[in-house]
Amino acid sequence: MFPFVPLSLYVAKKLFRARGFRFCQKPGVLALAPEVDPCSIQHEVTGAETPHEELQYLRQLREILCRGSDRLDRTGIGTLSLFGMQARYSLRDHFPLLTTKRVFWRGVVQELLWFLKGSTDSRELSRTGVKIWDKNGSREFLAGRGLAHRREGDLGPVYGFQWRHFGAAYVDADADYTGQGFDQLSYIVDLIKNNPHDRRIIMCAWNPADLSLMALPPCHLLCQFYVADGELSCQLYQRSGDMGLGVPFNIASYSLLTYMLAHVTGLRPGEFIHTLGDAHIYKTHIEPLRLQLTRTPRPFPRLEILRSVSSMEEFTPDDFRLVDYCPHPTIRMEMAV
């Protein structure tokens, strides 16, 4: 709903065109779209050239902008959304860190290591200089979730807790959960090593009994691993994908997780398959993503693991080196909270 008295269609069109939008007529729907129609932007591949895998992401953006359903959402900002999308990224010769904008690589590494520790304290991650969970751990946000009794930074039984202590009774972010619950991470490492053809090599963060205790229920909620020909591949199911900010981060995070698991189990990284449920673009991100769609992908970087480690707990941020990452400049987008 617009917070003003309805105007004639003619006047409304003039107002919105002045703000850089145009009206696109769809069957039964009058939708706003950017003045530069993203549907017209194409990234051509000529000859026998192998298409750049980042084009999958750009096509997803374009498809959502062109055909997305206009939906209300938890944040009140509003989104354009499509249901059910998939992309596949090879991990064999490169690492799928998007290049049409700079992705916060240090944040990807620090957040994943924080998950792997089982931590639920956003202040711990913030002390590393990665503040992506600060707003969700704020007093205001926790109170809005009915969690005003929690101290600032206590996110509840979110990703890391479910990965390392699934089923344990959550007390707070400061409690010691050693030996409590089911350690899914250790379980999948054991399966990959000892029963690699098992079809249950799954790690899941979606625990319905704990959802009301979480500052934010998991968006990327289930990953399954698959071993074939000495390679480890991963498929992620993500119920909710913020295409502007979250999805580029998630692609890198689960690709990194696959590299790490392959390293400790003596395998090679194979492929990352990313399956999205509600794939959406926040309306505040439309303009930045229009800019991103005008950019041509550059070669993906390579990822090197610099020392031999035998367990997931041994990894540190200094163990990873990104080689030849030359992205386009950063594109600023505000996080929807």
UniProtKB/Swiss-Prot annotation:
Which residues are noted in the entry as (6R)-5,10-methylene-5,6,7,8-tetrahydrofolate-binding? 242, 336
Which InterPro entries does the annotation name? Thymidate_synth/dCMP_Mease, Thymidate_synth/dCMP_Mease_dom, Thymidate_synth/dCMP_Mease_sf, Thymidylate_synthase, Thymidylate_synthase_AS
User: Per the record, what are the reactions this protein catalyses?
Assistant: dUMP + (6R)-5,10-methylene-5,6,7,8-tetrahydrofolate = 7,8-dihydrofolate + dTMP
Look up keyword DNA damage and say if it applies: no
Q: Name one GO biological process term.
A: dTTP biosynthetic process
Keyword set, alphabetical order: Methyltransferase, Nucleotide biosynthesis, Transferase
Task: List positions binding dUMP.
Answer: 74, 199-200, 239-242, 250, 280-282
EC number(s) of the enzyme?
2.1.1.45
What protein name does the entry list?
A: Thymidylate synthase
Provenance organism: Human herpesvirus 8 type P (isolate GK18)
The gene for this chain is 70
